[in-house]
C-alpha cells in the first residue's frame, strides 16, 4: 500500500526521491513526506493530500538540505492515525536525528508506546511508526549499541511484531541508510556509485535495472559504494539465490509512463492484446503445455482431487472464471474463495488439494496468509502473479506468471485479462497431466487462446460508442449488471470497476437470481448492462437470459446489451447494443470485459474523477 524510497549517492537526493514518489503514486496514498540528510542535519517535510502539496513544501526547503545526497521518501495510506500532516511519514525521534518511513503494521506498538511514554518520551503523532524512531534513538544513545546506528536498528527490529518494511536515516551518519522487511515488499536497486531501496522497482527504474529482492526478516545497510544484507541478528553469511534474489528488471521507464495517453488506465486497456499474447507466449512446447516455474510433477497433478482458488477483488473474479474452465476440462471440483475469508472458515485441505493463489502484486496480505495456511495443511500451492520474484510466488510450489508488464492504474485492467489467460493455461495443464483431454484437444484449445489478442484489439478499437454511452448515464444513481455462466463474473467485474472509478452504486447479479430480489430495484430509466452468452453455446442459457432482458425492459429499465456479432434475437430487446466477435463460451470474457472497462473509465471522467488514482484505494494491499 504505502510507497517507500530511499537513496544514497552522489546527486541531490530530493530530485531522486520526489521522482520516485511520483512513479509510486499508483500504489495509493493520502499523505506524503521526505527526509533529507546533509552535514549532520536532518530536514523533514510532510503534507496530507496530493503529492503536489509536498512539492510546494520541498520548494521552500533550505538550499543546504536540497544539496543533501541521502534521502527518504514515503507515500502513506493511513492505518494508525488520520491522514494529517502530523501523521505523515517520515517520523523522527525527539532530537530530530533519526528518521524512519514504514509500510505495514507494528502489532505490538501499543506496548512499546507505553514503555516509551513511561520513560518520558513525548509522541508527536498517532502512528505506530513513531515508536520505531524513538526506540532506535534510545538504543543509539544508551546501552550496548550506543553510537552504533546499524546495531541499534537491528536491536529494535528484533523487538517488533507484525508485518513491516522500515527504512531508517541518521543525521550523524549521512551516507548510510538501514532498511528491513518482514512480510511486506522491499527491493534494492544497484546503481553506479549510488544505491536505492523501494517498495517496488518503480522507485528506481529510471536509474537502474539491476535489483535485489530481500528475503524474510532481512536487513540491508546501503551506502553509495554498496550494500550488506544480514538477518535481524546481524548475521551476514547469506547467499544470493538462496536467501535473497538478485534479478534484472525486464521492463523500462517507458512502460511506466503514459506514452501519449490521457491516463494510465486508457493506455493499459490498449495494452491488453499484448498482455494476453505475452502471457501465453512460450507455454506450448513440443506439443505440451508448460508452466513457468513448474515444481509440481505430472504425477502430483494427477493426484489432485480438489482445487481451491483464493484471491481478492478483480483477481477473485478471474478465479470465478477459472472454476468454469478447470471443472469443464478436468472434471475436478473447484471452489473459489475470497482470500480474506479462506483461512477463517477452516477449509478442508490435504496433500491432494491444489490451492491456486492469484495476486497481481504477489504481496497481497490476505492472499499471502491464505497461501501460508494452505501450506500448513500440506496442500500444494500454485501462484498466478504479475510480479516476478515477489513473496507469494516464492512461497508456492509452482508459479504461472502473467506477463502484463507494470500496471500503474489502481483499477486492474490488463492484469485481469492476463489472469484469465493464465487460469486457462493452468486448466489445460491439469487436463493434460490427468488425461482428461487428448493432446490434439489441448493443442486446439491453446491455439484458440493464441488467436484472442487480435480479437481483443478489435474490441478495443470499436469502443468509441461505449464511451459516448457512458456520458449519457454518467449521472445515474445506480447501474445493475447481469450475466449467466461465464457472464456472471464479468458482470461482477463490471460493477466493481464502476464502483472503484466512478463512486457509483453498482451491483452485479447472476441473472437467474433476478426474481429472488434484485428485480425489486428495477424502475423506469434504470440502466442495466447485460452480458449475453453466445447463441451457439447453450440454447437454454441464451433463451433464459433473453427472457430476463424482456422482464427488466417491461419494467422500464434501459437495457445495454453486450452480445455476439450476428445475434439478431437480442436486438429487439436491447436499447443499446454492443457487439463483440463470436468466440467459444469460455473465451468470451476476454472480450466482453473490455466494454465494461471503457464504460467505467468514461463515466468516471464524465463525473470529473481521477481514473488512475480513485479515492481510498491502493494498488497493492499489503496489510490485512
Curated annotation (Swiss-Prot):
Catalytic reaction equation(s): D-fructose 6-phosphate + L-glutamine = D-glucosamine 6-phosphate + L-glutamate
HAMAP family associated with the record: GlmS
Name of the featured protein: Glutamine--fructose-6-phosphate aminotransferase [isomerizing]
Active site: 2 (nucleophile), 619 (for fru-6p isomerization activity)
Lineage, broadest ranks: Bacteria, Bacillati, Actinomycetota, Actinomycetes, Mycobacteriales
Domain spans labelled Glutamine amidotransferase type-2: 2-225
Top EC group: transferase
Keywords: Aminotransferase, Cytoplasm, Glutamine amidotransferase, Repeat, Transferase
Start and end residues of each SIS domain: 297-436, 469-614
Organism: Mycobacterium tuberculosis (strain ATCC 25618 / H37Rv)
UniProt main location, coarse: cytoplasm
Cellular component aspect of the GO annotation: cytosol; plasma membrane
UniProt GO BP: carbohydrate metabolic process; fructose 6-phosphate metabolic process; protein N-linked glycosylation; UDP-N-acetylglucosamine metabolic process
Listed transmembrane segments: none
InterPro entries in the record: GATase_2_dom, GFAT, GFAT_N, GlmS/AgaS_SIS, GlmS/FrlB_SIS, Ntn_hydrolases_N, SIS_dom, SIS_dom_sf
EC number(s) on file: 2.6.1.16
Pfam family, one: SIS
Function: Catalyzes the first step in hexosamine metabolism, converting fructose-6P into glucosamine-6P using glutamine as a nitrogen source.
GO molecular function, one term: carbohydrate derivative binding
Subunit structure, as described in the record: Homodimer.
Subcellular location: Cytoplasm
